[in-house]
């Protein structure tokens, strides 16, 4: 037989004489043991059966076997029933010796050659060239039923059936398993012949190196199986109703079924249910082995009695064998698939059902770590995900951003790398609310800057004005950008005042000075210009005293590690306004000590200061009114902030209204108010170059008296103070929010320019000389949004 797989496993492929002899023995066993005479069938089914049983040579020592078998091969002349002649034409009409030049199928050509030789032995040699067209197998051949030519479209048919019954039988099988000529069903049949009926289970010559004792055991084993278990199914029409043994479904009379005489005459199966009980494949050519009432193919029946070697596919007859992974091997065959080193008692790795030693497995199949690039050995732990591999260590299997270990915890694969959280996958530090994040990472540059500002030591010449001042300071959250802004504005103020000693030895030591400080983070809904000014008790004072008070303010901001927090988080961490009021009052007390000509201002605002100046300097009221007309108007300017967007609005100067607004805004964040108040104090102190009451009054006026909206040129008035409206509850829409804060540098430049322009212009009309400036009385409130 020209089977490449069989030639690789067996030194001598089965010959045509082997198939013929096997068929004869099988027929004799069934005829003599059960009374069934299959020798009466036509030569066509007989030759097909010789193809089936070719790989299952069953040695049955019987003298009657040869005679009966020879009679069967010769054409079934002995004991043949007359029913065979009704549907099978004479053999000389159906088969003849094939010509030497005819190309036969590479898989089944030896089988057909054997059948032609058998037919030629009976029919003679007179029709060698007269029926060449019959040898060209056609799937849809057309002929009458008496000729039997319709059976030639199959490579095998069940014995004892008419052509219409053959078609009825094959209609019960899947199309891909019907053995049409040159079809997938034919290839399936040949494959199952080799698999279900391995020749090495019956013939010594198909085995490799067997000892004399093992050869003897093989012959005894094969003969016993044939005698006790071998059989072939018979296909007939059912005469009565009975259930199918395979699927338990009822069968009715007239159905075509399969009988197995060794299991009992009352048991029958659908043609598609006649399968092996182990592999569930159709029993090829209806050849079966039975044991304990179950059907088996030849391979699995042999394995129920003897183990089979997984390497050579032969039955193990020796007393010793190796068992591994639920399978068995000969002792010498359990070796590495690559280097053939025997693995008995040694460590090995199974891959695709084949054993490998550790060295060969590492060489052929080891993976490389995606982090360190080293080989992951078989003795090392390995983590794998979506085609990627890592060492199972804290260093290799870790977050790509923060390098925290991911062993035993969920991870986030993204773009070929793994992360511990979504924040790390974006290159950001994890937020406190991120429960999936690992250990806290290193603080950002902004947080480091804030921490450095908060921990800076005080200057050497600082004097403690109030011993209990530290106890009144809270710990509001602040940002590093606010500290940078305060330090820069302090330097500008000191340069404007001409205090050189403070510039050389003062300030805040070690404070970084970025070229472009980040913007102040304002996260409140609305920022009132009046609220910014309302917290100041005094804008007068020595520059040194103001500098000395700054470290206390900066020290209260040391706890912040994340600059940009959500609005809700900032509000939760904000202290009450009482703490802010105490801090502002202490700053005013310090400033008052160095400014004795000016009395302490009340907490509520600047109104009493205006009244006192009117009483003391009434003769100069007109002059002050003229100065008021020449003063620049305070404007609202836009300050872009990336994270938030606030709204700003102007209020009136009435102190009672400011008290009400202060109580109404208890929940506002004190951090942003303290930042804005500090900016305003620094701006007012920076713009003051003299200490005369008139200059101080002008600076005070610039802060709050004439707050003119730059958009609609309207101002707030105390007349409409009782009608101040309240903003609705803020809804967070996301995105970028715009905040409005006074820009000190621009305000200072504009004020100087407007002062110069007004000095060149002719004097304004009705202006008082020594009194306080008059307050404008418009009745409009402006909201910039």
UniProtKB/Swiss-Prot annotation:
Task: Give start-end positions of Polar residues composition bias.
Answer: 15-25, 641-653
Listed Basic and acidic residues bias regions: 459-469
Secretion signal: which residues? none
Low complexity bias (residue ranges): 1-10
Composition bias of kind Gly residues appears in: 67-79
Q: Which UniProt keywords apply?
A: LIM domain, Metal-binding, Repeat, Zinc
Name the residue ranges with Basic residues bias: 657-666
Pinpoint the LIM zinc-binding domain residues: 242-306, 307-367, 368-430
Source domain of life? Eukaryota
Which biological process, per GO, is one annotated for this protein? dendrite self-avoidance
- Describe the location of the PET domain by residue ranges: 135-243
SMART domains referenced in this protein's UniProt entry, alphabetically: LIM
Annotated spans, Disordered: 1-86, 125-146, 427-484, 638-679
Q: Which PANTHER family match?
A: LIM DOMAIN-CONTAINING PROTEIN, PROTEIN ESPINAS-RELATED
The protein's name in its UniProt record = Protein espinas
Source organism of this protein record: Drosophila melanogaster (Fruit fly)
């Amino acid at each position: 037989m020209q089977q490449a797989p069989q030639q690789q496993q067996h030194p001598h492929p089965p010959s045509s004489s082997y198939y013929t002899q096997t068929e004869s023995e099988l027929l004799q066993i069934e005829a003599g043991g059960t009374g069934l005479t299959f020798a009466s069938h036509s030569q066509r089914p007989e030759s097909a059966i010789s193809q089936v049983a070719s790989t299952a040579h069953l040695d049955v020592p019987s003298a009657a076997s040869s005679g009966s078998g020879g009679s069967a091969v010769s054409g079934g002349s002995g004991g043949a029933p007359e029913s065979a002649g009704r549907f099978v034409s004479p053999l000389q009409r159906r088969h003849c010796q094939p010509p030497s030049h005819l190309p036969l199928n590479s898989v089944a050509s030896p089988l057909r050659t054997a059948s032609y030789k058998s037919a030629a032995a009976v029919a003679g040699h007179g029709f060698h060239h007269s029926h060449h067209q019959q040898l060209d197998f056609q799937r849809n051949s057309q002929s009458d039923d008496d000729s039997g030519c319709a059976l030639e479209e199959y490579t095998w048919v069940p014995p004892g059936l008419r052509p219409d019954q053959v078609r009825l039988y094959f209609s019960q099988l899947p199309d891909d398993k019907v053995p049409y000529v040159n079809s997938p069903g034919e290839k399936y049949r040949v494959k199952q012949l080799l698999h279900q009926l391995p020749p090495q289970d019956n013939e010594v010559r198909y085995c490799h190196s067997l000892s004399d004792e093992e050869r003897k055991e093989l012959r005894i084993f094969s003969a016993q199986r044939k005698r006790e278990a071998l059989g072939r199914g018979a296909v007939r029409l059912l005469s009565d109703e009975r259930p199918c043994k395979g699927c338990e479904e009822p069968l009715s009379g007239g159905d075509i079924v399969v009988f197995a005489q060794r299991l009992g005459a009352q048991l029958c199966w659908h043609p598609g249910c006649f399968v092996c009980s182990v592999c569930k494949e159709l029993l090829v050519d209806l050849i079966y082995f039975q044991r304990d009432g179950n059907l088996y193919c030849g391979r699995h029946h042999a394995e129920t009695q003897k183990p089979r070697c997984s390497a050579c596919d032969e039955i193990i007859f020796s007393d010793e064998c190796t068992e591994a992974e639920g399978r068995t091997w000969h002792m010498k065959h359990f070796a590495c698939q690559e280097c053939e080193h025997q693995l008995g008692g040694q460590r090995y790795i199974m891959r695709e059902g084949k054993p490998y030693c550790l060295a060969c497995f590492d060489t052929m199949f080891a993976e490389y770590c995606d982090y360190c690039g080293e080989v992951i050995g078989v003795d090392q732990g390995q983590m794998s995900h979506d085609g990627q591999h890592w060492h199972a260590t804290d260093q290799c299997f870790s977050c790509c951003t923060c390098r925290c270990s991911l062993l035993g915890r969920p991870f986030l694969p993204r773009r070929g790398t793994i992360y511990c959280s979504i924040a790390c996958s974006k290159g950001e530090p994890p937020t406190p609310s991120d429960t999936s994040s690992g250990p806290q990472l290193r603080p950002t540059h902004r947080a480091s800057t804030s921490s450095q500002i908060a921990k800076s030591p005080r200057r050497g010449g600082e004097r403690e004005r109030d011993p209990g001042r530290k106890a009144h300071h809270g710990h509001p959250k602040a940002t590093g950008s606010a500290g940078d802004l305060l330090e820069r504005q302090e330097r500008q103020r000191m340069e404007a005042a001409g205090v050189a000693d403070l510039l050389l030895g003062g300030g805040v030591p070690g404070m970084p000075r970025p070229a472009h400080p980040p913007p102040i983070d304002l996260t409140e809904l609305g920022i009132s210009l009046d609220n910014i000014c309302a917290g100041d008790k005094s804008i007068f004072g020595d520059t040194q005293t103001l500098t000395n008070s700054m470290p206390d303010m900066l020290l209260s901001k040391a706890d912040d590690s994340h600059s940009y927090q959500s609005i809700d988080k900032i509000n939760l961490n904000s202290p009450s306004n009482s703490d802010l009021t105490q801090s502002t009052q202490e700053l005013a007390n310090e400033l008052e000590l160095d400014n004795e000509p000016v009395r302490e201002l009340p907490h509520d605002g600047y109104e009493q200061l205006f009244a006192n100046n009117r009483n003391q300097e009434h003769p100069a009221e007109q002059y002050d009114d003229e100065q008021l007309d020449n003063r620049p108007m305070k404007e609202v300017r836009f300050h872009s902030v990336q994270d938030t967007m606030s709204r700003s609005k102007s209020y009136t100067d009435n102190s009672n209204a400011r008290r009400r607004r202060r109580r109404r805004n208890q929940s506002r964040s004190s951090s942003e108010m303290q930042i804005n108040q500090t900016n305003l104090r620094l701006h007012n102190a920076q713009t003051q170059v003299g200490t005369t009451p008139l200059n101080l009054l002008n600076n005070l006026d610039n802060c709050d008296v004439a707050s003119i909206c730059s958009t609609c040129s309207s101002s707030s008035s105390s007349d409409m103070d009782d009608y101040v409206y309240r903003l609705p509850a803020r809804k967070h829409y996301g995105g970028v929010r715009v905040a409005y804060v006074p820009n000190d540098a621009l305000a200072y430049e504009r004020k100087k320019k407007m002062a110069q322009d007004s000095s060149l212009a002719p004097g304004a009309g009705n202006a008082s000389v020594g009194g306080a400036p008059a307050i404008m009385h418009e009745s409009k409130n402006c909201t910039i949004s």
